[in-house]
Amino acid sequence: MINTYVEITEKDINPLDLINRVRRPDAGAIVTFEGTVRNDSDGVRVTALYYEAYKEMAEMQIADLIDEAKKKYNILDAAVCHRIGLVGLTEDSVVISVSSAHRSSAFEACRYIIDTIKERVPIWKRDILENGNGSWH
C-alpha cells in the first residue's frame, strides 16, 4: 500500500523527513528531488521567491497525481512537501521523495510528479527581484 504524504507549508522543509517517510524494506531505490531558489531568472537577479497556493486543492491534486504515478510507474511510496510564502535563495521550495523496487521507476515517477505539479497544481510563484520589482508565474 502506498503511503502518500503531501504537505503545503510555510515552514522549512526537511528532506530527510520525506526520505524516511518513503523508506521501506521492499524498496531498492529512493529518489529525492529538491527544487531550490536560485539567484537568476531569465538574466534578472532574484533575491527570493514568494509562493501562494489554493492549499486544499493543491494537496488534493498532488495526492491524485501521486496515485497516477503509482499506477504508471509501479512505485511503492511517495512524499511531497511544497513551501508557500517567502522562500530565500538556496532554500528548498519543493521536495519530492519516491521509493520503488528499482531505480528506473523511482527516477521516472519523481520527474513525472514535479513536471505535473508545475503544469496542473494551483501553486503560483512570484520572483522577488533585486531591483524591487517582481513577476508572477
Swiss-Prot record:
Record keywords, A-Z: Molybdenum cofactor biosynthesis, Transferase
Top-rank taxon: Archaea
Gene3D superfamilies for this protein: Molybdopterin biosynthesis MoaE subunit
Pathway: Cofactor biosynthesis; molybdopterin biosynthesis
SUPFAM superfamilies per UniProt: Molybdopterin synthase subunit MoaE (SSF54690)
GO molecular function (one): molybdopterin synthase activity
Record GO biological process: Mo-molybdopterin cofactor biosynthetic process
Catalysed transformations (reactions): 2 [molybdopterin-synthase sulfur-carrier protein]-C-terminal-Gly-aminoethanethioate + cyclic pyranopterin phosphate + H2O = molybdopterin + 2 [molybdopterin-synthase sulfur-carrier protein]-C-terminal Gly-Gly + 2 H(+)
Annotated EC: 2.8.1.12
Binding of substrate, residues: T36, V37, R38, H102, R103, K118, K125, R126, D127
Coiled-coil parts of chain: none
Family: Belongs to the MoaE family.
Record note on quaternary structure: Heterotetramer of 2 MoaD subunits and 2 MoaE subunits. Also stable as homodimer. The enzyme changes between these two forms during catalysis.
Entry function: Converts molybdopterin precursor Z into molybdopterin. This requires the incorporation of two sulfur atoms into precursor Z to generate a dithiolene group. The sulfur is provided by MoaD.
Name by which UniProt lists this protein: Molybdopterin synthase catalytic subunit
Organism: Thermoplasma volcanium (strain ATCC 51530 / DSM 4299 / JCM 9571 / NBRC 15438 / GSS1)
Gene label: moaE
